[in-house]
């Protein structure tokens, strides 16, 4: 790419949003020109909004320090240069996250979301590029089904644990070794649970043997990723049975 794509990050002051900013700093394809968060942070310079609450080991990227945080619901204030939006929103009600992401899509923005809010919507692709890049073929159906403009859509990434093992399972199947049953045990970092998990006293020198909702995601999301696109949405596969135990361990990343 000769020119970088100007992007926005929603939920930029939270832990996942901070990680987005860290990863996109000096990226060859993307340049962050817009950061959005809750009304509490809106109107502040980004460095001031996360003062005392920056959770990354690296320093705040220089390219975003002076960006003024936009209220995530203030569409009128979005920089006109923004062509793509990364969503790290984690609103208390997932329905609000789901609806707000589609509001951005209706405004003409491609939404690439880290949130789980839209993962189980039939017309939303959940992509691991090495496995199911063809699932982007559902996007025209999503746009037609929801009356979205040609430039607007929602696509999501899977839960953090999925890409650690599903690429291997897919490679086995592609090589002619079909997998029928899988037993998965994950040891997931504190960072996956957000700031509240990192600061929790119960996590010091401890392993939590259960993470609410994680086992369901680990067992079910692969079925969508390994599924196929139909005229009415993405059809999950039924050829594999996954059983998961998910634990939280006291490491940051």
Predicted regions span which residues?
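N-terminal Rossmann-like NAD(P) cofactor-binding subdomain of oxidoreductases
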Residues: 1-211, 234
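Charged docking surfaces used in two-component/phosphorelay signaling
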Residues: 192-253
């Amino acid at each position: 790419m000769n020119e970088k794509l100007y992007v926005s990050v929603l939920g930029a002051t939270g832990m996942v949003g901070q990680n987005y900013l860290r990863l996109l700093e000096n990226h060859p394809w993307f340049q962050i020109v817009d950061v959005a968060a809750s009304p509490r942070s809106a109107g502040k310079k980004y460095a001031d909004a996360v003062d005392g609450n920056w959770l990354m080991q690296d320093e705040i990227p220089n390219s975003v320090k002076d960006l003024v945080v936009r209220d995530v619901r203030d569409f009128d204030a979005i920089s006109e240069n923004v062509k793509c939006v990364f969503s790290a929103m984690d609103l208390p009600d997932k329905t609000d996250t789901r609806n707000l992401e589609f509001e951005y899509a209706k405004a003409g923005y491609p939404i690439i979301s880290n949130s789980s809010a839209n993962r189980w919507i039939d017309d939303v692709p959940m992509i691991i590029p090495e496995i199911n890049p063809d699932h982007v073929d559902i996007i025209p159906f999503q746009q037609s089904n929801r009356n979205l403009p040609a430039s607007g859509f929602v696509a999501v990434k899977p839960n953090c644990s999925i890409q650690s093992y599903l690429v291997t399972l897919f490679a086995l199947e592609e090589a002619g070794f079909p997998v029928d049953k899988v037993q998965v045990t994950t040891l997931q970092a504190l960072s996956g649970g957000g700031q509240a998990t990192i600061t929790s006293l119960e996590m010091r020198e401890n392993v939590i043997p259960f993470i609410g909702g994680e086992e369901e995601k680990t067992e079910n999301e692969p079925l969508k990723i390994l599924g196929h696109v139909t005229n009415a949405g993405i059809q999950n596969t039924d050829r594999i049975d996954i059983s998961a135990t998910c634990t939280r361990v006291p490491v940051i990343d």
